[in-house]
Amino acid sequence: MILSPARTRIKICGLTRPGDVDVAVAAGADAIGLVFYPRSPRHVSLALASDLARRLPPFVTPVGLFVNASPEDVERACEQIPNLLLQFHGDETPAQCEASGRPYLRAARMDPGFDLLNFARSYTSAQAILLDAHVEGYGGGGKVFDWSLIPSDVPRPVVLSGGLNPANVTDGVLRVRPWAVDVSSGVESAKGIKDAVLMRQFCEAVRDADARSIDASSGY
């Protein structure tokens, strides 16, 4: 892995309500995910996504999640949310991911037969590779995958996703040392409805992992 940050970035995905956005930001999220996949229970319209993105303070990034969307749909989202970071979660080719000229994340669906190194080398223009569980359909389904499948020399920054929650994210950060972590169902009371307590606990657990990592590297 090319980067092991002193502070692990946090993305909370699948936000649908203004109040949840405010709590996520206050808890310490560095990014919020807006789902543009119509089949997702966390799907938001472009109008709502724009409203949610406008609530964000400086240096908190809106991320738009797309699954095999048309170039026109991606372009409309970029026009409405000028600072949108793209996240492709379907079968998009490198050329399709690069078509808008915007920075993007590329999701990888992890299973024992998946060649992550070859996949990452195919998406050299990606800002990072987001690692999720391989389940039927798209998205990780709130499932944790085997973290031992992650090679130590992934040639892009890694975002760890897939079944993370306040109880396991500390271990995930310490074991994988990703650039960022991404959570959705692990901080929800219902699909698309975030739980304020769980969001705070998740962010605190990530910071605890960072502190432990610093202590370990310092010899304390």
Swiss-Prot record:
Belongs to the TrpF family. CDD domains: PRAI. This is N-(5'-phosphoribosyl)anthranilate isomerase. NCBIfam families: PRK01222.1-4, PRK01222.1-6. Pathway: Amino-acid biosynthesis; L-tryptophan biosynthesis; L-tryptophan from chorismate: step 3/5. It is an enzyme of class 5 (isomerase). Keywords: Amino-acid biosynthesis, Aromatic amino acid biosynthesis, Isomerase, Tryptophan biosynthesis. GO terms for biological process: L-tryptophan biosynthetic process. It comes from Leptothrix cholodnii (strain ATCC 51168 / LMG 8142 / SP-6). Its EC number is 5.3.1.24. The keyword Ribosomal protein does not apply. It catalyses: N-(5-phospho-beta-D-ribosyl)anthranilate = 1-(2-carboxyphenylamino)-1-deoxy-D-ribulose 5-phosphate. The keyword Amino-acid biosynthesis applies. One of its GO terms (molecular function) is phosphoribosylanthranilate isomerase activity.
